[in-house]
């Protein structure tokens, strides 16, 4: 299903890229020329999206041989292919753009997850919905391949009460309304921006509490309040921290006894992996 979705995205992207035709290739390369080539990772990476690219190439008659699977660390050749030279050159940039981007997300996620778990083996590193339009399912798949958590995919996955909901009805009323109107099968998460809102979320027994934009020292104070509430009531929610968290400061947050660290940077600030498509033989 995800492969089918990726193929639709790739074909639509190709349609835009080609326009009325690849005038460079068509003016230089004669019809009927066959070529063989490789896609090469020019830096170590976690491969992601290779099956999407194989499906894309094969849709246009290009035969492929995978050298690595999604989730594997790679360097050098990751895919071999052969077929019509004009077609290969037409597909090149569209294929590379997606493969480089998804592999970049998987690689960055993998690196950050390892850092976080070095100080807190139980913590989950999750992405957010700060994704590119139409690419969100693929970007979240890349986070998963890198060892991260996808968080909610869509608005119908769980209740997530954010600052603008709170601005209208307040923390307590928002949680009460969600419990009244949403199926018991859906967890209720609330984003809190200060200790007052935290206490209100605890009192209403939110399933998940997100400490949003809390500084490390504020997280420590919040956890004391949560622990005290647990001692009194035997209730403890899942604790998520989010806001301003990047690779260079992840350890400042992971050292605390939190369950989830969510990072928009996993999808909105990722560096693509350096890759190339090289023709190695033609006839």
From Swiss-Prot:
Residues given in the record as substrate binding sites: 93, 128-130, 152, 162, 191, 212, 242-244, 263-265
GO biological process: NAD biosynthetic process; quinolinate catabolic process
Biochemical pathway: Cofactor biosynthesis; NAD(+) biosynthesis; nicotinate D-ribonucleotide from quinolinate: step 1/1
Enzyme class, UniProt record, top EC level: transferase
InterPro entries, A to Z: Aldolase_TIM, NadC, NadC/ModD, Nicotinate_pribotase-like_C, Quinolinate_PRibosylTase_N_sf, Quinolinate_PRibosylTrfase_C, Quinolinate_PRibosylTrfase_N
GO CC annotation: cytoplasm
Catalytic reaction annotation: nicotinate beta-D-ribonucleotide + CO2 + diphosphate = quinolinate + 5-phospho-alpha-D-ribose 1-diphosphate + 2 H(+)
One GO MF term attached to the UniProt entry: nicotinate-nucleotide diphosphorylase (carboxylating) activity
EC number: 2.4.2.19
Keyword Lipid metabolism among record annotations: no
Keywords: Glycosyltransferase, Pyridine nucleotide biosynthesis, Transferase
Family recorded in the similarity comment: Belongs to the NadC/ModD family.
Function noted in UniProt: Involved in the catabolism of quinolinic acid (QA).
Subunit record text: Hexamer formed by 3 homodimers.
Name of the protein: Probable nicotinate-nucleotide pyrophosphorylase [carboxylating]
Organism, scientific name: Methanocaldococcus jannaschii (strain ATCC 43067 / DSM 2661 / JAL-1 / JCM 10045 / NBRC 100440) (Methanococcus jannaschii)
